[in-house]
């Protein structure tokens, strides 16, 4: 099994697209990239810990390749917005691909270069590619949020879905 970590704005919106793929064993919401061990949601939202909201994906590389996860990641984000994603603003919502191996880094960098060269976006691709740091699980009420709170999830992801429809369909 392998591990992938992606930050793409609110972690609530990043779970379902990955969870629906064959070969995915788990998708968990959490925090990474900061300087405070085991931060709380409130601390991360206060923008004082340096963490981003992210998802940790455990996957079977025999069933789904890391490259495919990176390609799916792009289609869930606005890779031209370094200061958050959609209605969620700030460093804790910035788009990041965290790599856990040098091979993941190479795949992510090549994929980013391909996306930039594709001309899909007029603006530069600003999603960063960074080494994975400790991943801290978010509180239980954040796990599987889209299943537990479908109406609130739909409301919180409306702007994201409009952008994805307009730019990735």
Swiss-Prot record:
It comes from the Bacteria. InterPro entries: Met_Sox_Rdtase_MsrA_dom, Met_Sox_Rdtase_MsrA_sf. SUPFAM superfamilies: Peptide methionine sulfoxide reductase. GO terms for molecular function: L-methionine:thioredoxin-disulfide S-oxidoreductase activity; peptide-methionine (S)-S-oxide reductase activity. It catalyses: L-methionyl-[protein] + [thioredoxin]-disulfide + H2O = L-methionyl-(S)-S-oxide-[protein] + [thioredoxin]-dithiol; [thioredoxin]-disulfide + L-methionine + H2O = L-methionine (S)-S-oxide + [thioredoxin]-dithiol. GO terms for biological process: protein modification process. Transmembrane segments: none annotated. Keywords: Oxidoreductase. Gene3D superfamilies: Peptide methionine sulphoxide reductase MsrA. The active site is at 10. Its EC number is 1.8.4.11. Pfam families: PMSR. Has an important function as a repair enzyme for proteins that have been inactivated by oxidation. Catalyzes the reversible oxidation-reduction of methionine sulfoxide in proteins to methionine. Belongs to the MsrA Met sulfoxide reductase family. This is Peptide methionine sulfoxide reductase MsrA. It comes from Streptococcus pyogenes serotype M1. The lineage of its organism: Bacteria, Bacillati, Bacillota, Bacilli, Lactobacillales.
């Amino acid at each position: 099994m392998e591990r992938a970590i992606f930050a793409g704005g609110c972690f609530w919106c990043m779970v379902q697209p990955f969870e629906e793929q064959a070969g995915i064993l788990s998708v968990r919401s959490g925090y990474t990239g900061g300087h405070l061990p085991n931060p709380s949601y409130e601390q991360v939202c206060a923008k004082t810990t340096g963490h981003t909201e992210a998802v940790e994906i455990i996957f079977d590389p025999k069933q789904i390749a890391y490259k495919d996860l990176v390609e799916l990641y792009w289609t869930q984000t606005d890779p031209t917005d370094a200061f958050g994603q959609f209605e969620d603003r700030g460093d804790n919502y910035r788009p990041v691909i965290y790599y856990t191996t040098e091979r993941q880094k190479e795949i992510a960098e090549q994929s980013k270069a391909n996306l930039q060269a594709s001309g899909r976006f007029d603006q530069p691709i600003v999603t960063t590619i960074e080494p994975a740091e400790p991943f801290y699980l978010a509180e239980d009420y954040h796990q599987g949020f889209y299943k537990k709170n479908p109406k609130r999830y739909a409301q919180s992801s409306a702007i994201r879905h409009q952008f994805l429809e307009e730019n990735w369909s």
